[in-house]
């Protein structure tokens, strides 16, 4: 019987969500604010998992991995904020085409958004660091969850992917519902 606790669940959710942030952001098509939303959301889940794990039923490797996920997420967030003036390459082209199309149809022209070409863009690979670090903690949590260990690890990893995919898809869909001009 597998024994799954809240700390493992929160780490699964955070790692899966952060992995799918990399999946959706690696082609440079989603806006910078979406990355901020995802990093904050899943960073808080990683922090919650770390706190619950330390207080309730510590698994040292899981907690160390959770702390590393949290630090990597904060670092990625800081780099993203520092480089925000560069914008996102794929989004720039889409925004310019849509603005021109709306202006042609309605005669309403929006102010052009300017980007700073002297600032480097956020490197999408940085979003992969936290999930890779979290993978170690998920394996440790799966082994700790019960026998058979291989099955418990597989359930933990598949659960992380499922939670991350579903939550990221919902957040992405709702993010674009509230974006003006899309």
Please annotate each region the language model reported:
Residues 2, 58-65, 151-157:
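Interfacial loop-to-helix junctions that mark the boundaries of transmembrane helices
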Residues 8-29, 168-170:
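N-terminal signal-anchor/start-transfer transmembrane helix
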Residues 13, 66-72, 158-160:
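Hydrophobic core segments of alpha-helical transmembrane domains in multi-pass membrane proteins
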Residues 84-182:
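Long, contiguous internal "core" modules enriched in hydrophobic/ aromatic residues
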């Amino acid at each position: 019987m597998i024994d799954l606790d809240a700390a493992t669940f929160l780490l699964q959710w955070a790692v899966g969500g952060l992995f799918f942030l990399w999946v959706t952001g690696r082609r440079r098509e989603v806006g910078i604010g979406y990355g901020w939303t995802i990093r904050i959301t899943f960073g808080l889940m990683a922090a919650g998992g770390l706190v619950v794990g330390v207080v309730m039923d510590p698994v040292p490797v899981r907690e160390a991995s959770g702390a590393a996920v949290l630090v990597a997420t904060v670092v990625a967030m800081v780099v993203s904020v520092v480089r925000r003036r560069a914008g996102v390459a794929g989004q720039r082209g889409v925004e310019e085409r849509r603005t021109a199309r709306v202006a042609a149809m309605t005669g309403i022209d929006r102010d052009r958004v300017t980007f700073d070409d002297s600032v480097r863009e956020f490197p999408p690979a940085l979003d992969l660091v936290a999930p890779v670090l979290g993978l170690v903690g998920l394996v440790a949590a799966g082994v700790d969850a019960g026998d058979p260990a291989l099955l418990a690890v597989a359930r933990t990893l598949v659960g992380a992917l499922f939670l991350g995919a579903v939550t990221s898809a919902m957040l992405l869909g709702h993010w674009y519902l509230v974006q003006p001009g899309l």
